[in-house]
Amino acid sequence: MLTPFNNFFQQRQNYHSSVIDHFENPRNVGSYDKSANDVGTGLVGAPACGDVMKLQIKVENDIIKDAKFRTFGCGSAIASSSLATEWIKGKSISDSLKITNKDIAKKLSLPPVKLHCSMLAEDAIKAAISDYQKKNGL
C-alpha cells in the first residue's frame, strides 16, 4: 500500500537534502499547554492537500524562548515546520514576523508545487504570535 510516508521515500531524489534532513530528523516536535499565558498557538491548514500545522511559541520579555510543532502532512510541510521553529527560537516577536514563506522555501529549495508548505509555516508563525499577543493584551 502506498502511503504519503512511503511515497516521500520513493520520491526522495526529488527533494533537497535539507528537506530530507528536517523530515528524517525533525527539530522541536511537541506541544505546550495552550492555555498558558506565555504560550501562543497557531493552527493552520491547507484544505487542498490536507496538511495541518500546529506551531507553538513560548515567549519571555518579547523573545521567543522556545518553539514546538506538530504537523500532519507531507515531508515538505514537516520540514517547513521544523525549520520555522529553529529560526524563531531566540528571536524577538518583531524579527520573527519578518520571516516569510520565500525565506523558508529558499532555504529548503522547495519546488513550486510545494510552496504552499512554506506558506503554512509563515502563517503558523503569525498565528502563534497573534494568539500570544491576544492572550496578553498586546
Swiss-Prot record:
GO biological process: iron-sulfur cluster assembly
GO cellular component, one term: cytoplasm
Gene Ontology MF terms: 2 iron, 2 sulfur cluster binding; iron ion binding
Record's subcellular location: Cytoplasm
CDD domains noted in UniProt: IscU_like
Co-factor(s): [2Fe-2S] cluster
Tagged with keyword Iron-sulfur: yes
Known pathway: Cofactor biosynthesis; iron-sulfur cluster biosynthesis
Chief location category: cytoplasm
Record text on cofactor binding: Binds 1 [2Fe-2S] cluster per subunit.
UniProt keyword terms in alphabetical order: 2Fe-2S, Cytoplasm, Iron, Iron-sulfur, Metal-binding
Subunit-structure text: Component of the core Fe-S cluster (ISC) assembly machinery.
Function: Scaffold protein for the de novo synthesis of iron-sulfur (Fe-S) clusters within mitosomes, which is required for maturation of both [2Fe-2S] and [4Fe-4S] proteins. First, a [2Fe-2S] cluster is transiently assembled on the scaffold protein ISU1. In a second step, the cluster is released from ISU1, transferred to a glutaredoxin, followed by the formation of [2Fe-2S] proteins, the synthesis of [4Fe-4S] clusters and their target-specific insertion into the recipient apoproteins.
Family: Belongs to the NifU family.
Stated name of the protein: Iron sulfur cluster assembly protein 1
Gene giving rise to this polypeptide: ISU1
